[in-house]
Amino acid sequence: MISVSDKNEVKRIIHTEDWPKSELIYGNFRQNPARPTLIAFTDKKAYAERKRLISGWFGLRYIRSLQPLMQQCINESIASIERAIDTAGGIVDMQNLCTGTAVDIIGTTIFGQSFDVVKNGSHPLPDYLRKMLKASGLLLFMPWIRSIPFRPTRPAYIDRFTLDIMEKRRATAKSAPRQDLLQKLVEQLDDAAGSKFTPFDVQGEVTIMLVAGTETTANSELFTLLMLVRHPDKLRRVYAEVDAWYPPGDLATPVDCEYSLQGMTYLQACEDEAMRLVPAQATGSPRESRRDEVVLGYRVPAGTTVFPTTQGVHHDESVWKDASEYVPERWLEIYEKGKVTEQHFWPFSAGSRVCIGKHFALQEMHLMLVNLLRRFEFEYVPGQPETTVFRVAQHMEAPKYVMKVRRRKF
């Protein structure tokens, strides 16, 4: 097992040659070794088949249709901040707010029901999944744990919850079909022996979507806000852009990604710069050499797990001037020249394993950040720990991160 952070080798591994994912690592992400989820396929052909089955539901047109559902969840987050301003002096735990909102959005868009984490503070399903996430983090770096007899599998609550909601959907598929991702998965179910998409597979996919679709997006939102409150001059420029696209005080007009996502380039630059400095996938999704290779002059035997450490490349001074600094402006010229794909920048990985939910995440981030910035002023609260850890996704080690929030005055 080795780690590589050379810009050219990382690009070769994850993009140019598109090495398959590591069996040693991703074998740990399977409830049933013979039934991997999309994230855990290591066979390229089998992965391509499952991706074809699912990828159509992550098309831009369908994702745009989910905006009203996402907005409902964000409205609850706005109300939560309003309550904190009125009752808690405007001190808001933005880490848990972003995470709770992301969980509620996944619940609404996949399961057809919000988990109301922002409103109630918790829900059994995401609580169980958070424990699974910690266990997965251990397995990522200590795969030998897999060999321990009677190692715990997926919690029974998760199996019961997902199976129950799936069976209810199957029963009402014709009489009252819903327009969400779970419904589309259920429509592809096949109980026949030898089927490539069984109820077990649906359980696995929706569970992974909930985990992968919350931690990565929520932390990208949090780190973007954190970078902005650390740099008030950048924050003021973002406010000016938000106000130019959505006139101050006109909160009746909803945020619309079709209208503003591509045009609000400075906000996007702030997001990209935050994802460069603190990428969710810091280790770049572990790959495997399927033949003897040479990496940076060293022989790498077939079967070696290789961590293409994208964060190392994102911080490389030979690639990025002032690499350790938060400089959103660097992206504006990149956008203008249409050279984003040419950058050594892989927050969503690359090649055939680029994140299938990339556009879902970018839409959610845009809706969340623009909605909050239209209404509130955010202020940095010093003295808090800001160390990050990596457990499947990179996030704050501390259980909370607060900011001072005030209503904007127009």
Swiss-Prot record:
InterPro entries: Cyt_P450 (IPR001128), Cyt_P450_CS (IPR017972), Cyt_P450_E_grp-I (IPR002401), Cyt_P450_sf (IPR036396), Cytochrome_P450_monoxygenase (IPR050121). Its cofactor is heme. Keywords: Heme, Iron, Metal-binding, Monooxygenase, Oxidoreductase. GO terms for molecular function: heme binding; iron ion binding; monooxygenase activity; oxidoreductase activity, acting on paired donors, with incorporation or reduction of molecular oxygen. Pathway: Secondary metabolite biosynthesis. Signal peptide: none annotated. Heme binds at residue 355. Its EC number is 1.-.-.-. Belongs to the cytochrome P450 family. Cytochrome P450 monooxygenase; part of the gene cluster that mediates the biosynthesis of macrophasetins, 3-decalinoyltetramic acids (DTAs) which feature a tetramate (pyrrolidine-2,4-dione) unit connected to a decalin fragment and that have potent bioactivities. The PKS-NRPS mpsA together with its associated enoylreductase partner mpsG incorporate one unit of acetyl-CoA, seven units of malonyl-CoA, and one unit of L-alanine to assemble the linear tetramic acid intermediate corresponding to the backbone of macrophasetins. This is Cytochrome P450 monooxygenase mpsF. It comes from Macrophomina phaseolina (strain MS6). The lineage of its organism: Eukaryota, Fungi, Dikarya, Ascomycota, Pezizomycotina. The gene is mpsF.
